[in-house]
Amino acid sequence: MAHLNVIPRRQFLKLVGATTVAGAAGRTYASAGRKISIVVHEADPIASTKPVAWAVKQLYQALSEKGIAPVMASRENEASGSSLVIVVSSTAPQSATFGRSPQMAPQSIESLRIVSGRVAGAEALWVSAADARGMIYGVLELADRVRCSSDASLGLRVTGAIEESPANRVRSVARAFCSEVEDKPWYYDKQFWQDYLDMLALNRFNRFNLAFGFGYDFPQGVTGDYFHFPYPYLVDVPGYADVRVMQLTTPDGKPLPAPVQVSKEEREKNFEMLRYISAETGARGLQFQLGIWTHAYQWTRSPGAHHNIEGLTPETHAAYCRDALAIILKECPEIQGLTFRVHGESGIPEGSYPFWETLFEAISGCGRSVEIDMHAKGINQIMIDMAAKTGMPVKVGAKSWAEQMGLGYHQADIRELEIPRPDRNESGLFSVSNGERRFTRYGYADLYQEGRKYDILFRLWPGTQRHLLWGDPAMAAGYSETAHFCNAAGLEICEPLTFKGREGSGIPGGRCAYLDEELQRGPQDWKKFAYTYRVWGRLLYNPATSPDAWQRQLSSRFGAGASVAETALANASRVLPLITTAHLPSASNHSYWPEIYANMPIVPDSEPSPYNDTPKPFIFSTVTALDPQLFSSITEYVSALMDGGKCAKYSPLDVATWLEGFTTASDAAISSLHSRASATSKPESRQWEEDVLIQIGLGKFFAAKLRSGLLYEIYRKSGHPKSGQLAVSKYSEAREAWAAMAQRAKGVYRSDISYGRTPGRRGHWADRLPGIDLDLDAMRKAVAAAQTPPDQAQLAKAELAVKLISEPAHHPAYDCSHTPAHSFAPGKPLSVELDARPANGKHEKLSADLYYRHVNQGERWRTVSMHEAGGKFAGAIPGDYTNSLYPVQYYFVLNSDDSATLYPGFNSTLSNQPYYAVWKRSS
């Protein structure tokens, strides 16, 4: 974070809003007639900074809310007579004892230490850190404990020491302005920003990204476009007097009688808010990042555009953008980073390098360090070198799981559709990202090169989870581990509700789209997702953090029902990431929205497919996984079953079994929670329960539909009558699960939950039922009209397959151990060993294969058979393969006569990395 100067004592107290020792000595700890003192050393170079003063204010207010006015002091001897002394200092307190704990602050950035002891004869807590951000986290930890406490200890009883350090260098939240109707209320609301930024800092996010120009994939078909090309909405640039924004419609899209220029007053109001937001972000020790995703100033094929930019030409465009950005950087000194989309969707044709060279002059000339974060799609060495030439820190932001949210690891491979091929290469606007760099679209591509001039940041795109409440601590911890995969910088999360109202689909009345006004929160809609932010923020900071960090919030909300509330949401939150990972009809969030799923037909030609970003024919069984290396499609799995082969991947049957387990656990927990009337009577508790029930319904639907798809594929291949009948039965079960869920949701959410203009991006669960019914009816007719084929051998195979698919998935159990390699020497073989044998002493002949690949999604996996001796398998990644610019990754497949099992595979919550990666190099 930026350098922060020590501020004078009087200013510090003013920022805290506290009284001095003399003025507050009479205010005591009411229950015992004793006082609490907060000691902040006046000359401490860390504790006496403005952001720490803000954090101390939070602690002061938390205690005040409990009826205690703490005494502020600058030295320990001013705290005499206290029942508790809280010392905020980067150096050891005077006249203090803290047991055997080291008398020194943490040394690594953003780390914190809270240790109990005694100061001036009183019980004491010492909060220490190596920098202001770590100190903020320590002080806010105490403030949060106080606010969530329900007894006289105020949550401040600490045994020993609390010591934490960040696992990820970047822990970011992005909030995008996509709708004039739905987003202006929060953009202009200063109280919203106070509360929202307080929450981000409390949950240990260290970066906030305000994104403009994020709502469209292309500068065409544009309607709602406020801030889409942001500069003229914010600043008046000298030398460009003719540049102005003309309003063509009302905010909801009704044409005006004549265009009206957006006023100087509105522009100044917009810019004043940007200055305010960036300053308030910095005041809490957060890095402020400004995202500018679109640099097009004209839209094509956009007759319904709400605005038009006048006064720019192709000749003045780049220089105008440079000069406008320079003004913004000068007037908003808290901007510490800029995020750019640099491929064709920005409106700048790929290969237009002079534009970016000109724009970057504003950054290199701003007089301070400003990070350049370039979106990875279409990135190439020319753009990387251009950014590095500015002398500024450079990051490349890769999508974590395409434009969706998968499980807590990085996909082991990309879909075949993302692999560059000559017949797929495009020219013109997307000559790079849809050409030889096609594999950069949805992942980390080939970014992990040794000696790179940039850092890698992952971005969790808002495709899978947008509208419903989600929060699984196990999954968040898994994402925390994978955010620094091979020493990446971390993760940026697109906030819940991202894209709400985009493409001119905004609807007044609140982004959460509830029917009941009691459930709406206006601009404070983030409060619905307070638990999501807490779980993800705290676990991105430290994946091993104590569960108390989120459970104390649950206890303050649900009381005795806290545990079952956590279990219900955690299991429900695994449904959609699992489906996204294992079965992806489109990588684009523009097309695929599994929360409100548009039905993909099982039966060929029963209805038009809503998706075409998937293998042909466009039916349910041919859809591949987002990770096709570890998950099989329905056709792939059924072919292996019918041919008597083995499939060394997780199957759709595995996925259905997991979904059934998660929904059963969530269902039981939410029923238990509902039985506690006091736990579900509040509006926020109703939000919790209803969203869990919707996700349970989705899980039941997909589990049954996957089984139906498997059975129908067997039927198509064999004509086996029973498989067809069971397919209809399972599809009927899926349909009933969806119908029941949708019917209840009709009483909770509006009929139009809008995330875009097309039917697939808006509407309600009830809207999707006719598509399901159409396909189910086609399946009934197909099965009823079929003739039993004469191939009895196929029928026998089908009978065995049907029996397998009608039960939960089962895998043989093995006792395995493997010590992952810590490093590799380029040019030398990387030897690995696996100790594996059947569990429970069973006698079974095993073989093992080693799968390996560079950490480069432009390459495919290789396989080598391992040598076995006494239950130990040995293999090696060849030296000529390790001699590369990339880290290496690997996993094992154990083979028996009738099965293939992955190792390490997944844990019970599907939240771990199912392979090993080695990025450190040795000589």
Which residues are covered by each model-predicted region?
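N-terminal secretory signal peptides and thylakoid transit peptides that target proteins
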Residues: 2-20
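C-terminal segment of N-terminal export signals and the immediately downstream linker at the start
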Residues: 26-43
